[in-house]
Amino acid sequence: MRATGALMIVAAALLGAAAACNSGSMPPGGAPGAASAAAVDTLRGTVAVVGAAPVTRVVLRPAGGGADIELVGAQRDALARVAGAEVRVAGRHTRGTASAPALEVASFAVTAVDGQPAVDGRLEREGGQLVLVTADGRRIRLVQPPAALADLVGGRVWVAGPLDREPQAFGLIEPRG
């Protein structure tokens, strides 16, 4: 009986040491521990909307592979609008609506669409020109923007393609508001 108790103490100590080394990423089992649930994590992947109405979920398909991660919180609807885009999301691990791991998203940025690099931000008109203002305050003057893009001034949009040429694609993330 004493050997079994000592073995359990050693096993508990090893588990505790392993948990202390956690960098905030999702453990292989998919359920975050108490320490990682409070940690902010940044993930990259492709957004997808899965399921059938009225029970759809917005998920991140991680760039490195692995299980889908449900994206929840105030950014959910904006993320649904960029389904198919590659994004970088930041947030905290939490419980989702399904058995899959979930991330309560605090912020995100569109990084690529259809294999083309992309940037997102608020669209402004400045002296007759369209300017994209990124989350970090960078101001990017858009070269030969399509006329339809002007209708989105005041909203958050993504623009794909080289920034020194006409945008190859664009889309709405959040309407002006």
For each feature predicted by the language model, list its residue ranges.
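Beta-strand/loop nucleic-acid-binding surfaces
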Residues: 66-80, 137-149
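Positively charged n-region of N-terminal signal peptides that target proteins for export
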Residues: 1-4
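OB-fold/S1-family single-stranded nucleic acid-binding modules
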Residues: 94-114, 164-177
